[in-house]
C-alpha cells in the first residue's frame, strides 16, 4: 500500500490528520507542526527565490509563531518573507514529497439525505424546529442504512432499516452509526446548506452542542454564514470530513444552464432516473402520515439518484 491522506485541517498549532497508512489501515492523529519560512540573505545559500535571490530557511517553533513572524515584518521595507504561508500545503509537501497515490476503495464516501416534518411549509435549518423523520445514508457499493419513525418492509438486501420509537432515538442511533463509520467524505444534494446544518442544529437543540459536535470525528465544528438568494444560511465544517455537495459540484462543473437545479430535474436531464412520484398526495407531509412505506422509499430513491449521478459524473 501507498499511504495517503483523506483530510488534513489545521487548528491552532496542530495539524489534524486523517488518512490511510502503508499497511492500508486508517489513521487519525493530531500532529504539532513546525512550519518554515525563508528570509533573504546576502551570502549564497542552497535556496533561491523564483527571481534569483538567495534566502535562508528558518524553522518556526509553532504555527502561531510563524504567523506572528509574518505579521511582524509584513510592512518592513526590503524584508520579504517567502515560503508557503498556507501551512497545510507546506505540511503536505513535507509529508508527501512525491506524488500521492490515492486508493479510492479505501476512502469512505457516504451520501446523505434527511426528511424533515413539513407541516408548516419548507423547514428552515436556522431554527431547526421541525422533527427529523427519516435519515438515509448510502455508500458507493449501494448499501443503504435507513433510520425512520415507523414501520417499513423491504425484501431488498442492500437496505438495512432501523425503526426508531421517536426522533431522539432516531438521532442517537444515527449518531452512533456515524461515529463508528468515520466517513472521509459526505455527499448529497444541497447537503451543505440543508441536511448537515439541519442535523447539527437539531441535535444541538434536542440534546446539546457537544453532542452535535460528534458529527465531526475530531469533535470540532466550525460555523459560517453564507448568503444565498438574499438570505443568511448556516453552513458547518465538520472537521475531518470533506463535504462534497453535488448541487454545488454540478453547477460548477457542467457548462449548461438548467431551468432548475432540483435533484429530480437534474437526474431526469442526466438520464439516471426519476424521483418517486407521490402526486396522489397533497404534499410530502400527507405522504408521511398516510403512506409511510412510500415515504421511506422516496427518501431512499433520492440517495440512490445522488449516487447514480456521482457514478455518471465521476
Where are each of the predicted segments found?
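Periplasmic solute-binding protein
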Residues: 251
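The two-metal-ion catalytic cores of nucleic-acid processing enzymes
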Residues: 1-247, 255-314
Amino acid at each position: 500500500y501507498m499511504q495517503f491522506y483523506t483530510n488534513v485541517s489545521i487548528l491552532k498549532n496542530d495539524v489534524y490528520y486523517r488518512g490511510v497508512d502503508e499497511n492500508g489501515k486508517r489513521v487519525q492523529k493530531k500532529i504539532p507542526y513546525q512550519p518554515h519560512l525563508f528570509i533573504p540573505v546576502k551570502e549564497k545559500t542552497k535556496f533561491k527565490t523564483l527571481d534569483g535571490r538567495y534566502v535562508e530557511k528558518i524553522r518556526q517553533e509553532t504555527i502561531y509563531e510563524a504567523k506572528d513572524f509574518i505579521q511582524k515584518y509584513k510592512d518592513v521595507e526590503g524584508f520579504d518573507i517567502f515560503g508557503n504561508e498556507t501551512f497545510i500545503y507546506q505540511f503536505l509537501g513535507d509529508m508527501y514529497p512525491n506524488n500521492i497515490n490515492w486508493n479510492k476503495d479505501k476512502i469512505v464516501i457516504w451520501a446523505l439525505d434527511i426528511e424533515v416534518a413539513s407541516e408548516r411549509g419548507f423547514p428552515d435549518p436556522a431554527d431547526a424546529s421541525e422533527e427529523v423523520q427519516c435519515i438515509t445514508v448510502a455508500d458507493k457499493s449501494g448499501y443503504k442504512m435507513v433510520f425512520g419513525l415507523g414501520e417499513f418492509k423491504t425484501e431488498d438486501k442492500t437496505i438495512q432499516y432501523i425503526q426508531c420509537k421517536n426522533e431522539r432515538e432516531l438521532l442517537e442511533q444515527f449518531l452512533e452509526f456515524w461515529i463508528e463509520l468515520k466517513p472521509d467524505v459526505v455527499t448529497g444534494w444541497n447537503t451543505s446548506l440543508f441536511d448537515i446544518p439541519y442535523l447539527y442544529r437539531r441535535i444541538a437543540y434536542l440534546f446539546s452542542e457537544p453532542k452535535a459536535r460528534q458529527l465531526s470525528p475530531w469533535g470540532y465544528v466550525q460555523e459560517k454564514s453564507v448568503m444565498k438568494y438574499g438570505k443568511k444560511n448556516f453552513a458547518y465544517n465538520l472537521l475531518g470530513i470533506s463535504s462534497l455537495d453535488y448541487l454545488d459540484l454540478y453547477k460548477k462543473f457542467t457548462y449548461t444552464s438548467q431551468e432548475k437545479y432540483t435533484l429530480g430535474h437534474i437526474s431526469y436531464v442526466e438520464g439516471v432516473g426519476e424521483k418517486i412520484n407521490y402526486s396522489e398526495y397533497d404534499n410530502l407531509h400527507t405522504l408521511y402520515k398516510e403512506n409511510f412505506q412510500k415515504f421511506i422509499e422516496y427518501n431512499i430513491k433520492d440517495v440512490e439518484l445522488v449516487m447514480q449521478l456521482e457514478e455518471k459524473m465521476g
